Regions:
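A generic structural signal for short coil/turn motifs at secondary-structure boundaries
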Residues: 35, 65, 126-130
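Short, low-complexity N-terminal intrinsically disordered segments enriched in polar/charged residues
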Residues: 1-48
């Protein structure tokens, strides 16, 4: 396999990994709508982008530390946190992916891999009193490639940087 093919495979991997966080933002906003159909749609996305045993942590000044395991555990945390609020919009900014390993088959398709990703988030939350609560944070993810599922997040840490309302 040529070095060009290897670099192409790495570029595709980076793009696929970045899209995990973008899909997460969409799923989280759906769950925040708090109706059964939207929560189920968000849950389906979470099951696609997270491995079955993903570990989740939220930390940072002014934030209650939270932990959960697995996509369904995280749906419960998100639904409880966002249900009292109005609509939300999670905007994903700067994304940096580092491919730690990427093993390709003879056709140039991945069959295993490890990566890390850092992503900025601005999350806007409508409050019941017409105010908007702004959460600024950084996601730190550990990601693996699974032949049956593709790239999935195995560990997610959300660290709050700042916020206001």
């Amino acid at each position: 396999m040529s070095s060009y093919q290897q670099e192409f495979a790495r570029a595709v991997a980076v793009q696929n990994i970045e899209y995990l966080r973008r899909a997460y933002a969409k799923a989280t906003d759906l769950i925040g709508l708090a109706d059964q159909e939207s929560v189920q749609a968000g849950r389906q996305i979470y099951h696609r982008i997270f491995s079955a045993d993903t570990e989740f942590t939220i930390s940072g000044e002014g934030t209650d530390a939270m932990r959960a395991s697995g996509p369904d555990g995280w749906v419960d945390v998100v639904a409880e946190a966002l249900a009292p609020l109005g609509p939300t919009q999670h905007l994903i900014g700067t994304q940096l992916v580092e491919i730690l390993s990427l093993d390709l088959d003879a056709n140039g398709s991945p069959h295993s891999g490890q990566a890390q990703m850092e992503s900025y988030v601005q999350a806007w939350h409508e409050m019941g009193d017409g105010q908007v609560w702004l959460f600024l944070g950084t996601y730190f993810d550990e990601i693996s490639f699974y032949p049956e599922a593709g790239w999935q997040i195995d560990k997610m840490v959300l660290h709050r940087v700042a916020g206001e309302n």
